[in-house]
Amino acid sequence: MDKVLFEIVCSDELLAQIEEHCFSQTRTEVGGFLVGEMVEGKSVVTHVIKAKHTAAQMTQLTFTHKTWDAAFAEMAKIKPDAELIGWYHSHPNFGVFLSDHDKFIQTQFFATDGRVTIVVDPIRGKRGWFISRDKEVVPYAKEEDTTLEKLGE
């Protein structure tokens, strides 16, 4: 059986919002949610919601019950039938990859084919997308430079 391939569609404006949030804190990870829709093989990001009430550490970001409640409340303001299609988070000076904890979040909450995550390393100035496909999380494309200038050497 052929694997279903999805295209990720995210505007430069929304990418800038994601990067600005990820560049705002380099002592701990930050993150948020990607709202949008799945249309004809495309994962279309239409809104970004910064995660609130997280338990953040240098190498880990945890979404608490309050985090999810706040995200769903914000989604209801955007559109009553808004769809959560993914999430984003930073890896300050750790590179672009998914840790075991990140993979857990993706496979538990965003396991449906086409659900996405983007990782941003503000120190190294890199970002990369990952996508759920066939019960796995795989890199969507090669990592690329962020539009904001990296914060470290």
What does each of the following model-derived ranges do?
Residues 1-84, 93-153:
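Conserved beta-strand-loop surface patch within small alpha/beta domains used
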